[in-house]
Curated annotation (Swiss-Prot):
The gene is infB. Residues 493-500 are annotated as: G1. InterPro entries: DNA-bd_dom_put_sf, EF-G-like_DII, EFTu-like_2, IF2_assoc_dom_bac, IF2_II, IF2_N, P-loop_NTPase, Small_GTP-bd. Pfam families: EF-G_D2, GTP_EFTU, GTP_EFTU_D2, IF-2, IF2_assoc, IF2_N. Keywords: Cytoplasm, GTP-binding, Initiation factor, Nucleotide-binding, Protein biosynthesis. This is Translation initiation factor IF-2. GTP binds at residues 493-500, 539-543, 593-596.
Amino acid sequence: MSSTTVAEFANELKKTPETLLDQLKSAGVPKAAPTDALTEADKQRLLGFLKASHGTAEPERKKITLTKKSTSEIKQADATGRARTIQVEVRKKRTFIQRDDGHPATPEVQPVAEAPAAAPAAPRIDEAELARREEEARRQAELIRRQEEELAEKRRLREEAEAREREQAEKAERAEQAEQEAARIAAEKKAADAAAAAPAKEAAKPAAAPVAAAAAAAEQQAADTKLAAQTAATQAKEDAKAKAAAESKARADEEAARAKDLDERRRKALAEAEAIRAMMNAPARVLVPHKAPEKPQPEKAAVKGTLHKPAAPAARPGAPAAPGAAAAPGAAGAGKEVKSAKLSSSWAGDPAKKKEIKTRGDASGGVGRGNWRGGPRGRRGSNDRGGHEEHVQAAPVEARILEVHVPETITVAELAHKMAVKAQEVIKQLMKLGQMATINQSLDQDTAMILVEEMGHNAVVAALDDPEAFTDEDVSAQTAEALPRAPVVTVMGHVDHGKTSLLDYIRRAKVAAGEAGGITQHIGAYHVQTERGMVSFLDTPGHEAFTAMRARGAQATDIVILVVAADDGVMPQTKEAIKHAKAAGVPIVVAINKIDKPDASPDRVKQELVAEEVVPEEYGGDVPFVPVSAKTGQGIDDLLEQVLLQAEVLELKAPVDAAAKGLVIEAQLDKGRGPVATVLVQSGTLKTGDVVLAGSTYGRVRAMLDEDGRTIKSAGPSIPVEIQGLTEVPQAGDEFMVMSDERRAREIATYRAGKFRNTKLAKAQAANLQNMFTDLSAGEVQTLRIIIKADVQGSQEALAQSLLKLATDEVKVQIVYAGVGGISESDINLAIASKAIVIGFNVRADAGARKLAEGNGVQLNYYSIIYDAVDEIKVAMSGMLAPERREEIIGSAEIRTVFVASKIGTVAGSYITSGSVNRSAHFRLLRDNVVIYTGEVDSIKRMKDDVREVREGFECGIKLKNYNDIKEGDQLEFFEIKEIARTL
């Protein structure tokens, strides 16, 4: 029974607690403080006293009844399986009894208390009767609610049973038994609640016999109500079963009739479609033009045409109808217009129509796959839905299957426009294919073509409508006589095998001495005038990091000189150079260098090269082998003779009086001269003032320098030169050509830059989505962020590739930015924002950048040899690796006694059998030589004193942390965990 305090009740009555205490005291309810509990019996006693004190006049003002109504909606499937919305209205009624205002009792009221049992008896009986009726109403409401719940549960179980009534009949029986058991338990619980409420009701009504009789009558009525409810529930179950069986049979009959009707309508629709198609394919007749009537007569049923096709012959008044238009008189007799885009009014709402390809074009209907035509789109497409006005309908056309030209990258919006559909439809199809995309996101060509095919159109690789298509026309329009040109020879081989030294002897220069570390770190281009003619040489790096440079050198060359040290043999980069030369399809001349050394073995080199499918001429192959010495000059003349002999066989020719074309060998950003590119002219003549297009950059040639730094005015075929005047630093390996005007060059460069950006963005988005779950599953991975600035493009590319190869599963390398030129303040700001380190390869930072780096703690690293840069980055990555944890056993002990202390717990009295034990050690508990627990030592005591360490041969008490299950005879093994730094 609920109870409240005097203060809470006074707050509800809007009285002061002191006033309520006085009234309670006058009513004979002993309450001394506002915090005392106030029961319902006390409230009834106070109510009776107040009624007796103030009389029972104006009873209509004593009670106020409020009715509250709330409406909600639920969705429930009907017998046909369709979801319907049901309005649920809940009504609540609450009665408030108006209390009298709290005024202290006056002395004139005291005589009323002489006979307290006579006067208040009648109102108390009325209140008891009211309470009994309210209790009965609540009981009835509870019974009705339970019945509704049972009926709802039965309905749900029935619907589930209907879906699988053939194979799960016994399961339905068990569900029904469970339902009956739940109803019985609910009834018993309700009876128990009523029995529990009876004593409280008796305590609230001590007035005796009439009240007891009323309570007995109420119990009897409750029992009768319960019996009636059970009988009604049983009857409702039987009725529900019969109704469910009838509904199931009716649904089966209805579905069979609907299927039959649908087949009939489809057959008629196909027949009408064939008739309309025959009418449209009939030869057109020449009609006399006349003004169309303002409003056609209803009896003249006609098939309207589109704006692009003449109307069908049946549309002319008085003309004979087409053979396929036999259905028109019936439609005219019904007084309705024939809809060419609509085969059946009932089939127009079929859900299968929604699966067709949606287009922005003529949506009035057309024959699609399987000769099925979609109905009209929008609200105005229904038959006579807009009132009495007539609608001009388009003639039936075949479903449009478009030929969509897909470029390398295309946004979702552009692709939707090409297919004449909404962008939302394209996004939905992408989601079905497992890719999330926005309306402005770029798609790569493969994804876009798959998407077009999925949407029922034909995808075609687009013939790019770009300005580059006109460059070939400009070049082909030029006619110039092809003249013999000098061969371009690339020197390739392993690092430190003497490639640059060999070229130095040929050029009579000392280039190798000027290279950092004595190794070549960028492509060197030279042309040498020999007694037998001119030869252009490209010196490529031999270090493993410069793979891309060697590949570019092989593409631009005519002949490859493969340098192999006689004392070292074939090495990894030698094999790689052979692959590059064979991929480029250029002949190879092998130079066996360092034959002047005592340990030189040319025969071993030949055997190793034969294993790589480079067979010398003396073994029946086609590759000349020349033993040379870059130190003494032995064999140099023979090598040049072999090179020129190969050039004569190739018959190298190129036009001279034409616009220049060639290849960018190397590029860099010079602080004083701006972007500088080393180019190799392959055909034509490059002159000062020409407009050059190189990749996505362009510019006018301001100056040209040869390999010796001398200014020249022109350069013919096979001549390497250094040009200035480009807008940006080009990519090494890009092709360059001379354009007719600067405007055309700017257009092409801008187009290439945008195309490169879109392609890069599409690939980056695909990579991000692809690696999303991989990154989540991999956990936290350390990342070393690096900014690279190098002197030339090739060195920057090689260094970036070498550092990316150092990445492991635990530490990754992220190249935040890589470029050429000195380190500027913008590079330092980028490093601050991305928390990266800055590497300068053969470049330095200016004063402003150094000051900014020192003030913000940015690490600057300068290198001139790629070995040093790779080694130091590897050390830095090793420091980011998580240390390796190793266990080192330090001792063991035997438990001889077990002590149990109330405040401490279980203590192991142990004897140290080997090694020692300290308080920071870990332990393993062994029982019968089986490890049963591993943990940490809590404390060690010896003779009641805490000690840090106990050595072999001593006894001590050991308290194990969070473990007490120890026995005599157990073994303790102590160990320490040490962290050891890992390396890559």
